[in-house]
Amino acid sequence: MGRKIKDFFKLNIVKGDIGLWMIYFLLCMVSIVTIYSASSQLTFKSERHWEPMVSQVGFLVVGFIIAVVLSKVPCKYFKLIPVVGLPLAFCLLVYVLVASKGVNDASRWISLFGISFQPSEIAKTMLIMAVAVVLSKLQKEEKIKTKKGTKIVVRATKGGYKKAFTIVGLLTFLICGAIAPENFSTAFMLFTVIVIMMFIGNVPVKLMMKGLTVLLVVRALFVTALLVLPVSTLQNFRRAATWKHRIEQKIGLEDVDKDSQKYKDDTRQVNMSKVAIASSNITGVGVGNSVTRDFLPHAESDFIYSIIIEETGVAGAVVVLLLFVMLLIRVGRVAQKCDRFFPAFLVVGLGLMMVMQAMVNMSVAVGLIPVTGQTLPLISHGGTSIILTSFNFGLILSVSRYAEGVVDKKGKAAKKIIEDEDTLLETDEIYSNVGMA
């Protein structure tokens, strides 16, 4: 079986790390099987039994083509993408704040030429790529002498970290600030990924702590304003009234009417998700035998992990979790192989974003954190998420192909040195024998 898989990759159809491709294919397979089972409500709305399934497979095929094409593009050209992509993404985010249409009670979507998509998905990738470019220019290698010999260390260029922090901070503020009004969870995750990238990129912790302190002060003032201002005033500011309602409920300032329709709607998803998990009885009810899918809102997207647990039990839950853990591990190995900073920062940022989104989705499904609306990458139903996740996979696979080339070159160079040394030893031995004669 393993040999057949290697033979498939030798067909030159796909390029890059085999492990990453296997994770990609397995996630797609889980998506197809689960969407077929979980999309009963979509099927009822469309009145066509196969429509949700066909659309999902169609998006996965398009995503696969994008991943294949990008995996064959040299990663050095990716630096050019955010030059155009980031300003475009910011403009789309501003547009969605002004003239967007609501989907699932959240105005996060825009429609262009009959295609609906979320600009925040594009903005995530563009910002990570831009930050990778900035941080890569900050790094430099220095040779230092130690007792064990010469050691190469990576440090920030003199004074460069302040410039990098300013640029990255400004870009992050603009993009996350534009995303937050309609999708706070995405803005928070993206901000967290950028902070981790800056930490890896040798930006001084003291400088980052100063920035975080300022943000915490702004956050405290913002929350205070939400609590003090009346609802009638906040209704003029998009979802501010909703945030006020949730904060007051969380800290116990607002009495919750459990008989109200709003309370029932807010808790229905969480309760039905718990019912789905409890119905699994550890071993699962079997693929396609879910009962909760007909009653759980957004079972095919936000709460698809609950359906996976219900049908496949603990085993299915662990397998999906391990796939994303393995993705993060493989991405880390690819970054370690890179001899240039930009591709290393790029794969780390994209990998962290995908895995963090998956962890948030799964945490919501099992009731660890409040509902966020985050989908499960490559598995949940949705075209924008699948296409852009595949785009990110393509970028990572291109870097993995570059990293493998670096390792091969180092291996060939080392082999040549060994061969040269063997030749010299043989020559010395010949001269030695001649001298002895």
Regions found by a protein language model. Give the residues of each.
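Alpha-helical transmembrane segments of multi-pass membrane proteins, especially transporters
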Residues: 159, 163, 167, 211, ...
